[in-house]
C-alpha cells in the first residue's frame, strides 16, 4: 500500500506474529521493503519469471497483463539487494548487484529504520519480544472470527484462562 505502507506492514506483522506456529521474517520485511517497480517483463531475471513470460507471450497475453502478473507474483521481488542505507547501491555492495536496488532505498533502509523509534523494524522487535514473554502466543489455541468478511481478519487466542482478541483491517 503506497499511502499506508508503514501501517499496512505493521498490521500484516501483527496478523502473522499473533497466529500459531513459527513466524518467518524474510529479508527486508522488517523494514517494509517494497517490490521493485519493474517497467517491463524483460526486467525480471528469475528463470521461472522468464519461463512464465515466454509462455504467456506465446499464448498471446498482452505485455501489460504479463507485467502485472510478474509484479504481483514473481520471486524477483524477494531477491533484490538489502537496503542498508541511503548510499550508492543501498550500502549493499560497491559493485553492481545482479538484481537492481529498489529506487526507494534512500527512504526505506535499515539506517533510517533504526533512527525512527516508530519504525516497522522496532515494531517487529516488540512483536518478537511479546512472543517470548506471552505463552498465549506460542501455546494458546487459535479461533478464527469473521471468516467471510473481506475487510477484517480477526481471531482469538486462548490459553490458561486468558483470551486475546486480534483484529486487523
Locations of regions flagged by a protein language model:
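Active-site and adjacent substrate-binding regions of carbohydrate-active enzymes
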Residues: 1-169
Amino acid at each position: 500500500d503506497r499511502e499506508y505502507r508503514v501501517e499496512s506492514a505493521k498490521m500484516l506483522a501483527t496478523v502473522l506474529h499473533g497466529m500459531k506456529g513459527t513466524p518467518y521474517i524474510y529479508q527486508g520485511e522488517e523494514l517494509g521493503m517494497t517490490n521493485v517497480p519493474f517497467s517491463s517483463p524483460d526486467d525480471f531475471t528469475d528463470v521461472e519469471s522468464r519461463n512464465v513470460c515466454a509462455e504467456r507471450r506465446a499464448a498471446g497475453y498482452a505485455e501489460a497483463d504479463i507485467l502485472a502478473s510478474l509484479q504481483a507474483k514473481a520471486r524477483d521481488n524477494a531477491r533484490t539487494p538489502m537496503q542498508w542505507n541511503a548510499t550508492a547501491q543501498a550500502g549493499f555492495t560497491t559493485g553492481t548487484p545482479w538484481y537492481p536496488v529498489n529506487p526507494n532505498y534512500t527512504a526505506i533502509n535499515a539506517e533510517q529504520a533504526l533512527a525512527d523509534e516508530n519504525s516497522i523494524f522496532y515494531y517487529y522487535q516488540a512483536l518478537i519480544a511479546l512472543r517470548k514473554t506471552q505463552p498465549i502466543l506460542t501455546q494458546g489455541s487459535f479461533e478464527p472470527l469473521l471468516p467471510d468478511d473481506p475487510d477484517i481478519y480477526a481471531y482469538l487466542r486462548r490459553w490458561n484462562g486468558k483470551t486475546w482478541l486480534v483484529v486487523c483491517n
